[in-house]
């Protein structure tokens, strides 16, 4: 998330920087924006759900951002963002529907393809955790250019498989806003407007994982990585 935030903030003009930065996020984009904005000496405000993990809210504040909390079940972060934008004139940097965010996150894909080449790997299925699709679409673009035999597959938690279903139907599907998941960082209502055409063109069929599979993967990561 820091890659995308830093990329987007670096692309701002001096006039845009003077207006300050506004973002909305469940936690990771929030921290990326806060850190990148502080590094550029730009004030930032981040809209976060009140039920986001406390550590993410606290860290976002510690990294320098002002945090505005909202009720994700009864309020729209987009509407809150639009109102704050009109009031203060801040520049809104979306968590995935921003070309510079996608480009920044795509650098992870460039590193993956470069490291794979060094290891002699020229064909693989690349599984990418997916919410709105910023990271996944960025990696997919990088692979399409530099590792054409890599198959990028979005991976989503059960109950929030909007991208997987959207790739099947060919149109943007939505999730039930009343559901919950261990994977709070990738709980999004639907694929991004900018990201979905990229996902549709460059990604292969996605995968859906259960809460039990998520916990098992976390345990393996702690034990072996």
Which functions belong to the PLM regions below?
Residues 2-225:
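PLP-dependent amino-acid enzyme catalytic core
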